[in-house]
Amino acid sequence: MKHPNTIDIKALQSSFQIIGLLGKPRHDVTLQMHKNLFQWLLEKGYQVLVERPIGEQLGLSENYLASVDEIGQQAQLAIVIGGDGNVLGRARTLAKYDIALIGINRGNLGFLTDIDPKNAYSQLQACLEDGDCFVEERFILEASVERNGKIIARGNAVNEAVVHPAKIAHMIDFHVYINDKFAFSQRSDGLIISTPTGSTAYSLSAGGPILTPQLNAIALVPMFPHTLSSRPLVIDGDSKISIRFAEYNTSQLEVGCDSQVALEFSPDDIVHIQKSPDKLRLLHLKNYNYYKVLSSKLGWLRNSV
């Protein structure tokens, strides 16, 4: 049975004419993979757009270079080479476009990168030419800062939005409202608001629950709360979360989106977090198994008896 969060790959596969190649290489060997994959895709007959900084390093001509937004506007598939951080950074931009995304893992855990670099070409060929893959839609979060009735800052998060003081080792006092109804007050180092995708990231480190990607749910996970009764809270994914702050808090507060974008605000402001209208579309290999990924990445594997 087809899951409602998946997309018909046959219809999408036929549209794969322009492919974007993205990712920030840490080492020369990764840059070599960009070069080899670029040539391989050209030989397969695809039109290829390369993220501008990478293309310039490779010495490609201008007609192959594009920004992340331009790739989102023109391409049907984005291939990101790197770790989850690379995928997160590109995904926040690409989510507003009608484009699928798949990652080649050059990082550590690689929860968002399906392709093994050792088998990259055979796996991509099976996906692009044989259709041995599927697209899964995942929701992302939108964080906004309200000041005097106006939104002054806005950002998207694939994994999580984190409310915290700008200085480390400082506690803050805040009140959380869900759908305009008071939920709880807390004194802690901050609050992690996580998507199912982000439940295996920062939220997991703070003792939050693992949410399977298909769940329409958001996890609220406290960071070092100053009470023994505080526990993570899982709420409906369509909820609107509003956070108000005590006036005596430090004047420098932030909402961090995927630990890559920071929205600064003051104690008089209100932070709103809710599901974004944009969606991330991840392209998975046909044999993708989320529970196998969990077991492998989190060390749950044991020898069978």
Swiss-Prot record:
From the Swiss-Prot or TrEMBL record, state where the protein is found: Cytoplasm
Q: Which residues form the active site?
A: 84 (proton acceptor)
Task: Tell me the InterPro entries matching this sequence.
Answer: ATP-NAD_kinase_N, ATP-NAD_kinase_PpnK-typ_C, NAD/diacylglycerol_kinase_sf, NADK
> Where does the chain bind NAD(+)?
84-85, 159-160, 170, 187, 189, 200-205, 260
| Cofactors, names only | a divalent metal cation
Q: Which Gene3D superfamilies match?
A: Probable inorganic polyphosphate/atp-NAD kinase, domain 1, Probable inorganic polyphosphate/atp-NAD kinase, domain 2
Q: Where is this chain primarily localised? A: cytoplasm
SUPFAM superfamilies in the record:
NAD kinase/diacylglycerol kinase-like
Q: What is its EC number?
A: 2.7.1.23
**What does UniProt give as GO cellular component?**
cytoplasm
Give the domain of life. Answer: Bacteria
UniProt entry keywords in alphabetical sequence: ATP-binding, Cytoplasm, Kinase, NAD, NADP, Nucleotide-binding, Transferase
Enumerate the GO terms in the molecular function aspect: ATP binding; metal ion binding; NAD binding; NAD+ kinase activity
Reactions listed under catalytic activity? NAD(+) + ATP = ADP + NADP(+) + H(+)
Q: Which GO terms describe its biological process?
A: NAD metabolic process; NADP biosynthetic process
Record flagged with keyword NAD? yes
NCBIfam families cross-referenced by the UniProt entry: PRK01231.1, PRK02231.1, PRK03378.1
Q: Which protein family is it in?
A: Belongs to the NAD kinase family.
Give the protein's function.
Involved in the regulation of the intracellular balance of NAD and NADP, and is a key enzyme in the biosynthesis of NADP. Catalyzes specifically the phosphorylation on 2'-hydroxyl of the adenosine moiety of NAD to yield NADP.
| Protein name, UniProt field | NAD kinase
Q: Supply the source organism for this entry.
A: Pasteurella multocida (strain Pm70)
